[in-house]
Amino acid sequence: MDHFTKLVLRHRLILVTLIGFITLALGYYAWQVEIRTIFTDLQPANHPYVQTNDKYKKAFGGVNVVSIMVEVEQGDIFQLEVLETIQALQKGLQHIDAINQFQIISLASKKLKSVAATSEGFFAEPLMWPGIPRTQAEIDALRTATANNPMASGNFVSADLKAALVTVDFIDRLIDYDKVYPQLKALIANVQKPGMKISLVGQPVLAGIVIEHLPETFSIVIAIVVAILVILLLAKGTIRGMLLPLLSATISCAWALGIVHLLGVNLDPLAVVITFLISARAVSHAVQLILAFDAERAVNHDLSARDAARIALRKLFRPGLLGLATDAGAMAVVALTPIPLLQKAALIGALWLGAMVICTIILVPVLLSWTRVHHEHRILPFRMDPVFNGVLEACSGLATDKRHAATVVIIALTILVGSGFLAKDITIGDANPGSPILWPESAYNQNDASINERFPGSDRMFLVVAGKENDVLKNPGVLDNISRFQQYIEAQPEVGGTMSLADVIRPVNMLMREGNPRFYSVAYDQNFNAELLFLAMAGSDPGDVDRFTDYKFRNGAIQMNFRDHKGDTIRTAIQAIKDYAHLNPMEKASFELAGGLIGVLAAVNEVIFSGQLQSIALALLILFIFCAVAYRSPQAGLFFLPLVLLSNTITFAFMAWHGIGLNINTLPVAALGIGLGVDYAFYIADRVKERFEGGADLAESIHFALSRAGRGVIVTALTMVVSVILWFFLSSLRFQAEMGMLIALWMTVSAITALIVIPSMIHLFKPSFLVGSSTQNTHRQSNVLFMSR
């Protein structure tokens, strides 16, 4: 190690010049990194639900669905101005990018038809197309026709007639949320009239809102950087103590994001919080190196800056590299989850951590070697050392007193068991109705609640009926099974309503029987069902029944609406569908789960549920292996596990208590945080080992470690906790606020564990990889006692 550190500092000018050129080049590309949401990144591609969705979404509807509700303040929607607004929305949506022209459905579309039987035959005509009724008599007739139309009433016109719904599907492969959302907002603004409210919800709207808040996000980032600078300045009072941690974080960021751009990887807007999670590592390691440098200078005033930097690098290279390696290992585990968003997050994290080896662990000591230590200028006249010293003395007092140390370990064990018990209640998926990205009182979530109150639900899932031959969807057994399934699933409180090909056939069959409601059912003859479908589709346009069947009547879909997409809601509905399919098999067809937004979310939740415990176990295994190798002792692998377990169980328990679900948005933070803060313990442990091998007893070694490395732990934790808490107070996005709160909690628990629990464990258990064997330890204590005499 001495040879390596001397080599680094001997060629420091070449090294810094090379790093500078690389930073300029990669920084140029980092500035061009694409920040956008790609919905397919959220989908586990190999999951059967996602494969079903991808196979049938072009016909049956994908995940990018927007619902627009027109609600009147007075009277009902059957007023000329309101009907004009609905028609304007229907026409205006056709000009929005990536729209599926055949899947715009409203009262003003051709797809909602009124079927009538007269002495001259059957007539099927649109309820309100191509024109709208102008006279009061025509409007009254439309009201009556709508109320008697089972496809329109309740689904596209509310039961109280005070609201109308317009739904539209977007083509997944063409949609650009950055363009679509402003176009939707502009359309709403153009058709909005006094006396009515227009509500807008759906995945494209939600993604657009997140993108719209990017300027606010960048403003918060600037505020956080300023907060970090202030805290570092208060902690150290010097230019180098303030700027070097941020400089190392910035350079490593430029390297990582530059390479990410060159690889063609995008950065999701919600992943901005993750960048602070990773940046915390650079700040932490840089602060430890600066404090080690200052400590060497304080002990030996004649020591040159170059020698002090060399010693600091030599002493901290192992714990620093071990900390980065364990973090990288935890992120490598995340990459095993078959969700592109997590794989990209893991790639960014791994690249960033790899860059820190050079940009932090090596660069910071090199830059410190040029410091004019004899002419150090303090910007602030006062120091926070007395505060830090008081905290560290208290920690040392707890850890070096056997009774207190035992109490600390018992309390930590109790908290571990208790938080682990509470953590089991964490919700997989969304824990609350509405979008967890936004606050409950946000306009979007209020609109979503309003739509779900008046209509079957804004979130959709389709269940595929896959036939084994053409025209199977005309088979009476298949149609009867579909009808019975609809009755069964609509009885589930999670499902707001369903629609299928059977809903097209039933009203025509009733009309054939002079309107007798006894015949509101499918026919029991395949040819008769074919005739009923022919009558229903007479005069229809291409795509009118695409939501329910393909043109060969081989594969169909049962469309289901959900009033929320909570994890429990989705799991209960999926299980109910599986139970029905198992008990009601079909000879000529089968049910295939599941498409639409709910189907994709169900797939994500199942992947998270099956993989989260596995990810944590693998991350702990990696921590064990790395520690065992670094300290050449399996005991070391076990010793540091309590810190990681404690921080994780407390964080997950907090999520369960606070109603934060483990979903596709929170999982990257939760997964990347598995190994967060363990480097704190490495620095403490290495300093104990260093002092003990230098001849001190165990209590003095613990005191020394806390006074040196403990100061860095406090500064780093304080810096990151205060800064990320700004997300909570400044962000309009609930997700960012809650993730900031989670990171703050994670850092706090890790810091407390490293400062109190780990030293207490060292004092009680005297691990041999730090203090040698019990015989050596006894001999050491005897020597110290003899010398004291």
Question: What residue ranges belong to the model's regions?
Answer:
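Signature of alpha-helical transmembrane segments and their immediate interfacial
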Residues: 1-37, 366, 380-432, 446, ...
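Alpha-helical transmembrane helix bundles of large polytopic membrane transport and channel proteins
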Residues: 18, 84, 88-157, 170, ...
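Extracytoplasmic
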Residues: 58, 84, 129-239, 480-483, ...
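Interfacial segments of transmembrane alpha-helices in multi-pass membrane proteins
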Residues: 212, 216-265, 336-340, 614-659, ...
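Hydrophobic, glycine/alanine-rich multi-pass transmembrane helices and their short helix-loop junctions
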Residues: 231, 321-364, 368, 624-627, ...
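Short helical (or helix-break) motifs at transmembrane helix termini and adjacent helical loops
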Residues: 277-298, 320, 326-327, 362-363, ...
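Helix-loop junctions and hydrophobic alpha-helical segments within the transmembrane domains
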Residues: 296-325, 691-718
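Juxtamembrane segments of multi-pass membrane proteins
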Residues: 399, 404-527
